[in-house]
Regions:
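Domain-level signal for soluble alpha/beta catalytic cores
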Residues: 2-236
Length: 238
């Protein structure tokens, strides 16, 4: 990624919370996993920054969704049931984020958001962790929409999502995964028109075919992503 020209790289910590790691019986290693992941990314980012000091590279701590949500029931016969509480989730996120901050991340990226309540738990945990560690870094959010109507899996529109998180000190809001780059454009336009933050995007390479592979070529995706820049759909919101 850095050789290709990236300014920001993510840590390899997408599912590195005790909630998600419990499925693999390694939840006791969450702190160690996050510390190691940040240090690895930090080392290589600093290496590239040293080569070109006028182009600093940054490390964003990847905070992904968990395998349990606060808004949806895993039991179709009991829609009121929740697999965990907000406080339990916030505590798990805080454990992850404190390790990231101690290891030296430049930003926190709460990504692939499909449940706004989960995201709010992560935002709360981030604020608590930054206060405890005594370090403040930019807070980045990235949502994934699950249908062509632009709603998240938990049913919120992008406008409703923005309203739900407007209390937070946010650096950027964006979209990731979801559909291909071209299909994501109208939703980026919605964000840019409403959000008083920087806008980001990193879509999938289209949707997989029946064999589970992707037909879109790197060159095709690059052309579509280039349109985001030329048409002002990423960067500072309008």
């Amino acid at each position: 990624y850095l050789v290709a020209g990236a300014d920001i790289i993510e840590t390899n910590t997408f599912s590195s919370t005790s909630v998600s790691m419990a499925d693999y019986h390694v939840q006791e290693y969450v702190r160690e996993i996050n510390l190691a992941a940040v240090r690895l990314a930090r080392e290589v980012a600093d290496e590239f920054t040293a080569l070109t000091p006028d182009k600093p590279r940054f490390v964003a701590g990847s905070i992904g969704p968990t395998n349990k949500t606060c808004s949806m029931s895993p039991d179709v016969n009991n829609p009121a049931f929740r697999a965990l509480t907000y406080d339990e989730l916030a505590a798990a996120y805080r454990e992850q984020i404190e390790a990231m901050l101690e290891a030296g991340v430049d930003a926190l990226l709460i990504e692939t958001i499909f449940d706004t309540l989960n995201a709010k738990a992560a935002i709360y945990a981030a604020e608590q962790a930054m206060e405890a560690i005594g370090v403040r870094v930019p807070l980045m959010l990235s949502v994934t929409v699950s249908d062509i109507g632009g709603r998240t899996l938990s049913g919120q529109t992008l406008e409703a999502f923005l309203a739900s998180v407007q209390h937070a000190d946010i650096f950027s809001v964006g979209l990731n995964c979801s559909f291909g780059a071209r299909q994501l454009k109208p939703f980026l336009e919605q964000l840019a028109a409403r959000a008083p933050y920087y806008i980001s995007a990193y879509p999938n390479a289209g949707l997989p075919n029946s064999l589970g592979t992707y037909d879109q070529t790197p060159a095709e995706m690059a052309d579509e992503i280039r349109e985001y820049v030329h048409e002002g759909q990423i960067g500072r919101a309008h």
